[in-house]
């Protein structure tokens, strides 16, 4: 077990329901989203984590899929996975993963946190790995778009080398748009005296970089973010990390839900495709107390995953079993 000194006093925690914000950004452009109700936020929350996207790397609808129902139904449109972390007391904001939809996601982040004016208003970006939905949004911080200055980008060593040595990412470093900050496995980064981020290496396809998840620890609560992993068993055998122990130690766990089950991709041998299935993770925690099951928020679901649809039978199965499904606009409190 890995200890992070988590405060498990549930009475001090606050979370907000899954208010799905309609309006979406496809690869062809962004539709207008309704103005978020910023007045409904709990003013007592000083540090909060906001879901800015819950889909797999390409979001939904996906390119080349003209029959996708999401073209006509905003409720089925997905931004790729991304979390926003805001420290209201210190006026600091951070992103976890930068997708190709980062422009729309930052607009959402601004609206939900009351940020106005020009500029990206970010104090750091934490990247999990070098697959398109998780880092490709960095390109928008370059001179062709935002023209950011010295934006801290927190990455593991292989990922740092990949960004420095390959275009167009190397240009971001050379021009000072981003400033690479090296991470080490299980070594916490202090963002303040009440907010830390700890990377945890996980098994995954590592063509260009390592892959990590993060534990984000605030004054009152903590969250685990593991959007991509090959299997929970491999995490245990290769890195001696138990997903059961991790979920027990944190208050919120945003975990890989790429595929619902092994029948999802018709005509494909899904045994050749890693990622723990939603049904597998549910079975793993089936006998856990309700207080543990409700900490799990399934995220990073593929466009084929039926939990993408809030009205699907599979969504109801997940919710009835006591688990949660992350939706864009969800927010949880890490410190009051």
Segments (PLM) and residue ranges:
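Residue-level marker for buried hydrophobic side chains located in beta-strands
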Residues: 94-96, 126, 223-225, 253, ...
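Short internal beta-strands
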Residues: 151-159, 254
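Cap/insert and terminal regions of metallo-dependent hydrolase folds
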Residues: 222, 230-331
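Bacterial signal peptide processing site
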Residues: 31-33
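Active-site metal-binding motif and surrounding structural segment of the metallo-beta-lactamase
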Residues: 87-95, 99-154
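Core dinuclear metal-dependent hydrolase active-site scaffold
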Residues: 36-111, 115-117, 181-246, 330-336
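Bacterial N-terminal signal peptides that target proteins for export
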Residues: 6-17
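C-terminal motif of bacterial Sec signal peptides marking the signal peptidase cleavage site
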Residues: 27-29
């Amino acid at each position: 077990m890995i200890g992070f000194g988590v405060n498990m006093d549930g009475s001090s925690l606050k979370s907000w329901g899954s208010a799905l914000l309609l309006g979406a950004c496809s690869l062809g452009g962004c539709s207008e989203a309704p103005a978020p109700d910023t007045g409904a936020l709990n003013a007592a929350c000083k540090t909060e984590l906001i879901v800015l996207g819950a889909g797999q790397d390409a979001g939904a609808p996906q390119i080349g899929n003209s029959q996708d129902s999401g073209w006509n139904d905003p409720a089925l449109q997905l931004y790729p996975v991304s979390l926003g972390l805001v420290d209201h007391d210190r006026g600091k904001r951070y992103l976890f993963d930068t997708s190709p939809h980062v422009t729309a996601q930052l607009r959402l982040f601004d609206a939900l946190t009351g940020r106005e004016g020009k500029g990206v208003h970010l104090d750091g970006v934490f990247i999990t790995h070098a697959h398109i939905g998780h880092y490709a949004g960095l390109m928008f911080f370059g001179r062709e778009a935002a023209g950011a200055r010295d934006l801290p980008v927190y990455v593991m060593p292989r990922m740092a080398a990949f960004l420095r040595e390959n275009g167009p990412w190397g240009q971001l470093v050379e021009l000072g748009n981003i400033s690479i900050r090296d991470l080490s496995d299980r070594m916490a980064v202090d963002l303040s005296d009440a907010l830390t981020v700890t990377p945890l290496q996980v098994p995954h396809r590592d063509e260009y970089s390592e892959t990590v998840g993060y534990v984000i620890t605030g004054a009152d609560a903590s969250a685990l973010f593991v959007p991509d992993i090959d299997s929970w068993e491999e995490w245990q055998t290769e890195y001696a990390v138990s997903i059961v122990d991790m979920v027990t130690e944190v208050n919120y766990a945003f975990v890989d839900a790429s595929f619902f089950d092994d029948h999802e991709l018709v005509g494909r041998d899904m045994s050749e495709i890693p990622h723990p299935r939603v049904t597998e993770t549910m079975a793993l925690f089936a006998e856990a107390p309700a207080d543990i099951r409700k900490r799990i928020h399934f995220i990073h679901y593929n466009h084929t995953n039926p939990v993408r649809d809030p009205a699907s039978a599979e969504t109801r199965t997940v919710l009835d079993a006591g688990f949660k499904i992350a939706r864009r606009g969800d927010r949880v409190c890490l410190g009051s």
